[in-house]
Amino acid sequence: MNTEIAKLLDSNFLTYLLEGKNIDENDGNLIERLTDLLTLINDDSVELVITPLLRYEFLRKFGQNESEDFNKFRAAVEEFTWLDISKDVTDLATNLYRLDKHEADSKGIPKNLEKRKFDVFHFATAKINGIELLSNDKHIDQMEDLYERYQAL
Protein backbone atom coordinates (compact mmCIF):
# COMPACT_ATOMS: atom_id res chain seq x y z
CA MET A 1 0.00 0.00 0.00
CA ASN A 2 1.33 3.42 -0.94
CA THR A 3 0.15 5.33 2.12
CA GLU A 4 0.48 9.08 2.20
CA ILE A 5 -1.93 9.86 5.04
CA ALA A 6 -2.71 8.01 8.27
CA LYS A 7 -5.79 8.52 10.44
CA LEU A 8 -6.08 7.25 14.01
CA LEU A 9 -9.48 5.71 14.77
CA ASP A 10 -10.92 6.28 18.25
CA SER A 11 -12.91 3.42 19.77
CA ASN A 12 -16.22 5.08 18.89
CA PHE A 13 -15.21 5.16 15.23
CA LEU A 14 -14.11 1.51 15.48
CA THR A 15 -17.58 0.72 16.83
CA TYR A 16 -19.28 2.63 14.01
CA LEU A 17 -17.07 1.03 11.40
CA LEU A 18 -16.98 -2.57 12.60
CA GLU A 19 -20.32 -2.95 14.38
CA GLY A 20 -22.46 -0.23 12.84
CA LYS A 21 -23.76 0.59 16.34
CA ASN A 22 -24.39 3.76 18.34
CA ILE A 23 -24.86 5.94 15.27
CA ASP A 24 -27.10 8.92 16.01
CA GLU A 25 -28.85 9.38 12.67
CA ASN A 26 -29.96 12.86 13.77
CA ASP A 27 -26.33 14.00 14.15
CA GLY A 28 -25.65 15.45 10.71
CA ASN A 29 -22.00 16.13 11.53
CA LEU A 30 -21.44 12.50 12.56
CA ILE A 31 -23.18 11.18 9.45
CA GLU A 32 -21.00 13.41 7.28
CA ARG A 33 -17.83 12.23 9.05
CA LEU A 34 -18.85 8.58 8.71
CA THR A 35 -19.54 9.11 5.02
CA ASP A 36 -16.06 10.61 4.73
CA LEU A 37 -14.67 7.60 6.62
CA LEU A 38 -16.21 5.22 4.10
CA THR A 39 -14.51 7.20 1.34
CA LEU A 40 -11.19 6.95 3.20
CA ILE A 41 -11.50 3.18 3.48
CA ASN A 42 -11.44 2.93 -0.31
CA ASP A 43 -8.56 5.39 -0.72
CA ASP A 44 -5.23 3.59 -1.13
CA SER A 45 -3.33 6.70 -0.03
CA VAL A 46 -4.99 6.63 3.42
CA GLU A 47 -4.20 4.17 6.17
CA LEU A 48 -6.50 3.75 9.17
CA VAL A 49 -4.49 2.99 12.30
CA ILE A 50 -5.13 2.03 15.92
CA THR A 51 -3.04 1.49 19.06
CA PRO A 52 -2.94 -1.43 21.50
CA LEU A 53 -4.87 0.78 23.96
CA LEU A 54 -7.63 1.35 21.39
CA ARG A 55 -7.74 -2.40 20.76
CA TYR A 56 -8.20 -2.95 24.50
CA GLU A 57 -10.82 -0.22 24.82
CA PHE A 58 -12.84 -1.64 21.92
CA LEU A 59 -12.58 -5.36 22.79
CA ARG A 60 -13.15 -5.13 26.56
CA LYS A 61 -16.86 -4.45 26.07
CA PHE A 62 -17.50 -8.00 24.83
CA GLY A 63 -18.52 -10.11 27.82
CA GLN A 64 -17.16 -13.52 28.68
CA ASN A 65 -20.27 -15.15 27.20
CA GLU A 66 -19.89 -13.25 23.90
CA SER A 67 -17.00 -15.34 22.58
CA GLU A 68 -18.25 -15.46 19.01
CA ASP A 69 -18.49 -11.66 18.72
CA PHE A 70 -15.24 -11.21 20.63
CA ASN A 71 -13.33 -13.52 18.30
CA LYS A 72 -14.88 -11.97 15.19
CA PHE A 73 -14.04 -8.40 16.21
CA ARG A 74 -10.62 -9.36 17.57
CA ALA A 75 -9.80 -10.73 14.12
CA ALA A 76 -11.13 -7.53 12.54
CA VAL A 77 -8.97 -5.19 14.63
CA GLU A 78 -5.90 -7.29 13.88
CA GLU A 79 -6.21 -6.11 10.26
CA PHE A 80 -5.46 -2.49 11.16
CA THR A 81 -2.00 -0.98 11.19
CA TRP A 82 -0.76 -0.44 14.73
CA LEU A 83 0.99 2.54 16.26
CA ASP A 84 2.95 1.95 19.43
CA ILE A 85 2.38 4.14 22.43
CA SER A 86 5.86 5.61 22.78
CA LYS A 87 7.55 7.41 25.65
CA ASP A 88 6.90 10.70 23.82
CA VAL A 89 3.19 9.86 23.72
CA THR A 90 3.09 8.99 27.42
CA ASP A 91 5.01 12.17 28.28
CA LEU A 92 2.57 14.35 26.34
CA ALA A 93 -0.48 12.52 27.74
CA THR A 94 0.88 12.90 31.28
CA ASN A 95 1.58 16.60 30.85
CA LEU A 96 -1.84 17.29 29.33
CA TYR A 97 -3.55 15.41 32.15
CA ARG A 98 -1.53 17.30 34.78
CA LEU A 99 -2.31 20.68 33.19
CA ASP A 100 -6.01 19.83 32.86
CA LYS A 101 -6.18 18.75 36.51
CA HIS A 102 -4.28 21.85 37.67
CA GLU A 103 -6.57 24.20 35.72
CA ALA A 104 -9.72 22.47 36.98
CA ASP A 105 -8.49 22.43 40.59
CA SER A 106 -7.38 26.08 40.53
CA LYS A 107 -10.79 27.17 39.19
CA GLY A 108 -12.73 24.87 41.53
CA ILE A 109 -14.29 23.08 38.56
CA PRO A 110 -15.23 19.46 39.21
CA LYS A 111 -14.08 17.40 36.25
CA ASN A 112 -14.21 13.69 35.63
CA LEU A 113 -10.65 13.35 34.38
CA GLU A 114 -10.79 9.57 34.78
CA LYS A 115 -13.39 9.45 32.01
CA ARG A 116 -10.83 11.01 29.67
CA LYS A 117 -7.78 8.98 30.65
CA PHE A 118 -7.84 6.85 27.48
CA ASP A 119 -8.80 9.75 25.23
CA VAL A 120 -5.79 11.79 26.29
CA PHE A 121 -3.57 8.88 25.15
CA HIS A 122 -5.36 8.72 21.80
CA PHE A 123 -5.06 12.48 21.41
CA ALA A 124 -1.35 12.44 22.35
CA THR A 125 -0.70 9.55 19.95
CA ALA A 126 -2.22 11.53 17.10
CA LYS A 127 -0.26 14.68 18.00
CA ILE A 128 3.11 12.93 18.37
CA ASN A 129 2.61 11.08 15.08
CA GLY A 130 1.28 14.16 13.26
CA ILE A 131 -1.96 12.50 12.23
CA GLU A 132 -5.66 13.19 12.63
CA LEU A 133 -7.68 11.51 15.38
CA LEU A 134 -11.09 10.42 14.10
CA SER A 135 -13.35 10.59 17.14
CA ASN A 136 -16.88 11.55 17.99
CA ASP A 137 -16.00 12.50 21.57
CA LYS A 138 -17.21 16.03 22.22
CA HIS A 139 -14.26 16.90 24.46
CA ILE A 140 -11.59 16.38 21.77
CA ASP A 141 -11.92 20.07 20.85
CA GLN A 142 -11.30 20.90 24.52
CA MET A 143 -8.16 18.75 24.40
CA GLU A 144 -7.01 20.69 21.36
CA ASP A 145 -7.41 23.93 23.33
CA LEU A 146 -5.59 22.35 26.28
CA TYR A 147 -2.78 21.26 23.96
CA GLU A 148 -2.41 24.82 22.66
CA ARG A 149 -2.20 26.14 26.23
CA TYR A 150 0.40 23.46 27.03
CA GLN A 151 2.45 24.42 23.97
CA ALA A 152 2.42 28.05 25.14
CA LEU A 153 3.96 27.20 28.54
Where are these regions (language model features)?
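Short, well-structured N-terminal submotif of metal-dependent ribonuclease cores
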Residues: 1-50, 60-74
